[in-house]
């Protein structure tokens, strides 16, 4: 088992504190209410990485096809946490999270199970998550479909706090190779699953303002989830239809260069909290509610 020092994460914006209280009330009476927990623990090493401030640009990846595929290289090991502002402007977040005693099947199950009720989504990050309905929700519970058939080409409509900003987002999941990953490299890297996506603001769903790469791979003690977030405008995003409008749309939405750098920091904190918290509850939650023997 990987040796890690975990520390409580205790600072949440006032809107997030109020959202926690609302979520706490809403989850009462649900069979999974015991998994709604106020304590969020994160790796101390990840906190210390984020506290160092923005990363040097030389250590970042862009959303280019070339940089995406660097994530699949045999010698690629992601840093645990970090954020930066790329030219564009574009918010950048990187992370690598360890899920002890978890399997790829557990994480796939989570993405099929949690969007079916808003209260399930709040288990993931009780202070930040509001709801995450799925456009084609019937596909999530269709046992004749594979995980990939259920998720890819489907859209989650997430409402969540990132810092003190309530964001309404459409997360358009795609086959990773449609996003730029090389099929041969993806196969050779033995990735166990991807929940990668394009993301748009809810009021302009045809304008991708973000690319998210989430790749997970099992190890003897559990699994690792390696993630990259790019939010904003960048020449490499032009391969996605509508992305040429991203800079103007974000500026109109109050996300200029200064705000995007703040968003990068807040997304780094959000990612650290939500996925480490999910890792702490997923094995028991899956055992109780998946129906798996």
Curated annotation (Swiss-Prot):
It is an enzyme of class 3 (hydrolase). One of its GO terms (molecular function) is hydrolase activity. Keywords: Hydrolase, Metal-binding, Zinc. Induction: Expression is positively regulated by GacS and negatively regulated by RsmE. Its cofactor is Zn(2+). Signal peptide: none annotated. Belongs to the DAPG/phloretin hydrolase family. This is 2,4-diacetylphloroglucinol hydrolase.
């Amino acid at each position: 088992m990987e040796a890690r020092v975990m520390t409580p994460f205790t600072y949440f914006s006032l809107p997030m504190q109020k959202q926690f209280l609302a979520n706490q009330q809403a989850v009462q009476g649900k069979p999974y209410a015991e998994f709604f927990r106020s304590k969020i623990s994160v790796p101390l090493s990840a906190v210390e990485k984020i506290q160092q401030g923005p990363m040097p640009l030389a250590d970042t990846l862009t959303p280019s096809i070339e940089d995406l595929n660097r994530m699949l290289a045999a010698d690629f090991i992601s840093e645990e946490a970090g954020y930066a502002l790329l030219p564009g402007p574009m918010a950048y977040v990187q992370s690598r999270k360890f899920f002890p005693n978890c399997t790829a099947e557990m994480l796939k199950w989570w993405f099929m199970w949690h969007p079916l009720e808003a209260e399930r989504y709040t288990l993931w990050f009780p202070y930040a998550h509001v709801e995450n309905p799925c456009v084609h929700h019937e596909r999530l519970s269709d046992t004749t479909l594979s995980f990939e058939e259920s998720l890819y080409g489907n859209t989650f409509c997430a409402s969540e706090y990132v810092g003190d900003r309530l964001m309404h987002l459409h997360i358009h999941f795609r086959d990773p190779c449609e996003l730029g990953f090389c099929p041969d490299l993806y196969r050779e890297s033995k990735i166990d699953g991807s929940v990668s996506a394009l993301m748009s603001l809810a009021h302009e769903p045809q304008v991708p303002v973000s690319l998210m790469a989430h790749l997970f791979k099992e190890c003897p003690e559990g699994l690792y989830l390696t993630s990259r977030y790019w939010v904003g405008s960048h020449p490499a995003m032009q391969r996605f239809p509508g992305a040429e409008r991203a800079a103007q749309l974000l500026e109109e939405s109050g996300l200029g260069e200064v705000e995007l750098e703040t968003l990068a920091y807040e997304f780094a904190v959000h990612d650290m909290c939500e996925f480490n918290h999910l890792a702490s509850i997923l094995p028991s939650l899956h055992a109780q509610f998946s129906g798996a023997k």
